[in-house]
Amino acid sequence: MKIKLMKYYFSIISVLILTSCSTISGIGDAVGSINPFDRSDEKSKAAQGKVAGDTDRISILELNETLKESENIKPEQIVLPPAYSNVSWPQVGGNAAHALQHTDAKGSFRKLWSKSTGKGSNRKGRVVAPPVTDGGYIYTMDGNNLITAMDVISGNKLWKYKVALTERQRTRKGRVGVIERVRDPLSLLDGSGTDKESVGGGIAVENGKLFVTSGLGVVSGLDSKTGEEIWRTVTRTPMHSAPTSAGGRVFAVSDDNELFAFNAETGEVIWTYQGIVESARMLTAPSPAVVGDTVISGFASGELIALRVQNGSVLWQDALSSAGQLTPLASLNDIASGPVVDDGYVIASAQSGVTSAFDLRTGQRIWTQPAGSLNFPLLAGDFVYLAMTDGRIICMSKTDGSVIWIKQLRSHKNIKKKKKRISYSGPIFVGERLMVMSSRGKAITLNPYDGTIIDEFKIGGNVFIAPVIANETVFVMTNSAKLIAFR
């Protein structure tokens, strides 16, 4: 009987305590302010900040730190190094350091020729690899792993090479016939073994060899004049980045963030470094940067790591990530282009909204700006130019990151409704002009001293890849795999 009474009294006391908790001043408000989904309290709404309605859109920049033009450096203080005519553009970013500086081109541009190089972007593959040129030939990679060599003057096709694998070398699942299994019993160990799609990879040319990486999980070395395969190495992992060739080695990053160093003569794997695995990444063709005995690579995780080219030992590492509130884009920290190295500075951009400069030797962070990009920063002397993900082109000081000018290009086809976003690739220098390409099929040139638009003209196709320049000729690869030459 006593036990039953005790249970009864305990129940009454518990109910009274819970009831009183809901009436204690401040507790209800505190709980409401913690809950980010509560819309019933005005104080809670104020704490959450601006909330998007059915017709409202909140800029990501409202949720993060914004860029501001510096009062210390004025556009008239910009001094560029002398322009020069570069003979070649042998790898992604122009050279192994991704820093070709102030490349030259004179006068207004006219189309020289336009050639189809294969299949454009489709559900099985994407055109992500920029063209490269050794000065005589220009090389392309289409959306179906077809490599084409053309004459830079006429655009005439000289040879083709299709990246393909034997059944046992496949990296993705599909159908393999009984006959193939009988011919190669070891293929039973490889699953069903057919690649249905291939995204990623790129090309680089050096010392008479064209190096090819692909989403099929194969790296090849070709004779750059004939297209003959000299060597191939199967990585079993799809390759994401374009190759970087320097000092007898070829560097590339796989889909699972593994950095490979290959022997440029034989294709033998010298060493590998495994970064943090990150499944989400942008559809671009980044590449590691190499200067002297140091290779610097960015990864989809936002990691930026410097290693010794000889053995892959880590010299220093850092990470680029958005410091603002979490947004869908800010959660993707992919360094989607690659680092740029010049004069002891390493500069890299993550698409999540960060651009930072580091000391090449120590890895110490020098400055950071809230500027996200899918493109390589463009260095010229003491200044950095960047095409941001929101359509802004900016000029910054290389030494301290001060923003000198900001130019907002058209961000959407329908500005009022914020529909059909426009992206920009580049920039590159064409003499005393910056040039960017629009995903809506336009080339735009800007004044590098203040960002004003000088000219714009139609290209003849949508473009998502940065243009390249050699011998004062600009080459543009469209999303439909058409290569267009302007001079």
Walk through the language-model features, giving the residues of each:
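Structural signature of WD-repeat beta-propellers
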Residues: D142-G143, N207, S214-G215, S254-D255, ...
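Bacterial signal peptide processing site
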Residues: S22-S25
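Short loop/turn segments that connect beta-strands within beta-propeller blades
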Residues: D151-S154, D223-T226, N263-G267, V309-G312, ...
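Short coil/turn segments that connect the beta-strands within blades of beta-propeller domains
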Residues: N86-V87, G135-G136, N207-G208, G247-G248, ...
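WD40 beta-propeller blade core
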Residues: T148, S220, F260, I305, ...
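C-terminal motif of bacterial Sec signal peptides marking the signal peptidase cleavage site
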Residues: I17-S20
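Blade/loop signatures of beta-propeller domains
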Residues: G49-E69, P75-L112, V314
